Curated annotation (Swiss-Prot):
Pfam families found in the cross-reference section: GCV_H
Protein name: Glycine cleavage system H protein
Coiled coil: none
Family as reported in the entry's similarity comment: Belongs to the GcvH family.
Subunit structure: The glycine cleavage system is composed of four proteins: P, T, L and H.
Residue numbers of N6-lipoyllysine PTMs: K63
A biological process term (GO) from this entry: glycine decarboxylation via glycine cleavage system
Record function comment: The glycine cleavage system catalyzes the degradation of glycine. The H protein shuttles the methylamine group of glycine from the P protein to the T protein. Is also involved in protein lipoylation via its role as an octanoyl/lipoyl carrier protein intermediate.
GO cellular component terms, A-Z: cytosol; glycine cleavage complex
Cofactor binding comment, as recorded: Binds 1 lipoyl cofactor covalently.
SUPFAM superfamilies: Single hybrid motif
The protein's required cofactors: (R)-lipoate
Amino acid sequence: MAVPNELKYSNEHEWVKVEGNVATIGITEYAQSELGDIVFVELPETDDEINEGDTFGSVESVKTVSELYAPISGKVVEVNEELEDSPEFVNESPYEKAWMVKVEISDESQLEALLTAEKYSEMIGE
């Protein structure tokens, strides 16, 4: 199962890619495989503030609805609108096409609490 080294991970199976002061957030390959076929993705609006640990959306699969938890705090600067019409991208390409939001980081110290690829792999038993 893919766990890209350049990303950081949350205990709730979100991944974070940091570029400057912007973090791109999505869910991991492990998370999408546990959920099954994704049929709907609900995301926040651009300019919404999200707070670490709070829900910022949800992913609905044929099995269940799963909340998305913000791994960091900040202002949403971009939302992946393609997921509205193509939620299957979450299954097909969780680390590329299926990024969910881009957030302007408000507290960089929160990044230190995220897991490395190695630690995340251990957590999911890979």
